[in-house]
A protein has these predicted regions:
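Loop-to-helix entry region of an early transmembrane alpha helix in multi-pass inner-membrane enzymes
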Residues: 62-66, 76-92, 126-130
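Membrane-interface transmembrane helices that cradle and orient dolichyl/undecaprenyl
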Residues: 102-107, 143-158
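Transmembrane signal-anchor helices characteristic of membrane glycosylation enzymes that use polyprenol
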Residues: 13-39
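Transmembrane alpha-helices of multi-pass, membrane-embedded glycan-processing enzymes
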Residues: 68-72, 85-96, 136-139
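Short acidic/glycine- and proline-prone juxtamembrane loop motifs at membrane-interface regions
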Residues: 122-136
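Extracytoplasmic catalytic/substrate-binding loops of multi-pass membrane glycan-assembly enzymes
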Residues: 34-46, 55-67, 76-80
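Membrane-interface alpha helices of multi-pass inner-membrane proteins
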Residues: 52, 158-170
Length: 170
C-alpha cells in the first residue's frame, strides 16, 4: 500500500511531464484522424500551395506549404495528413518551452509551465488545424532558447543556430 503522506504521487518530474505530453500528442493525432471538420479556407489554400512549391507566396512564407507537401507525400492527400504537422509542431513547441523554462528557472517550474502550455484551450485548438502560426511559434521558441544559450556560452554553434532559427521564422 502507498503511504500518501510520504510520497506525493502528483509531484511532477521530467518523465511524467514528457509522458503527459506524449499522451496529449496521441490524443490530438487521434482527434485529427477522426475529425469531421473539412479544411478551412486557409488550410485549403496552403494545401494548394503545397502542390506548387515556391520560395514564397503573395501573403505568407513558404514553410507551411513545404510542411504540407512533406506530410501529404508520405501519407497521401487527406484532410488529416494536411493537418498532421500541427500536433507534431505543438509537441515540439512544448518541448522547447520546457527547455526555455528550465534554462531560466528550474526543472519543477519547467514541468509546470510546459503542462500549463499543453493544456491551454487555444493551444489544444491550434494543434488541430494547420496554420502559419504553428511553425512560426516553434521557431520563435527555438530562437529564444538559442539566444539564451548564446548569452551564457562562448560556443560558436549557438549564434549560428540562432540565425538559422530566426531565418526559419520568416
Amino acid at each position: 500500500m502507498i503511504d500518501f503522506r510520504k510520497k506525493n504521487i502528483f509531484e511532477l518530474n521530467v518523465q511524467k511531464t514528457f509522458l503527459f505530453l506524449l499522451t496529449i500528442f496521441i490524443i490530438k493525432v487521434i482527434s485529427i484522424l477522426n475529425s469531421p471538420l473539412s479544411l478551412s479556407v486557409d488550410e485549403a489554400q496552403y494545401w494548394d500551395w503545397s502542390n506548387n512549391l515556391d520560395l514564397g507566396y503573395f501573403s505568407k512564407p513558404p514553410f507551411i506549404a513545404w510542411l504540407i507537401a512533406s506530410t501529404t507525400y508520405f501519407f497521401g492527400i487527406t484532410e488529416w495528413s494536411i493537418r498532421l504537422s500541427a500536433p507534431i509542431f505543438h509537441l515540439l513547441i512544448a518541448v522547447m518551452i520546457w527547455f526555455i523554462s528550465k534554462s531560466i528557472y528550474n526543472i519543477k517550474v519547467a514541468n509546470f509551465i510546459t503542462l500549463i502550455w499543453a493544456t491551454l484551450p487555444l493551444t489544444s485548438f491550434g494543434s488541430l488545424i494547420i496554420s502559419t502560426d504553428t511553425p512560426l511559434l516553434l521557431f520563435w521558441c527555438m530562437s529564444l532558447f538559442t539566444l539564451l544559450k548564446t548569452l551564457e556560452s562562448n560556443k560558436i554553434i549557438w549564434p549560428i543556430l540562432l540565425g538559422i532559427s530566426i531565418g526559419l521564422e520568416l
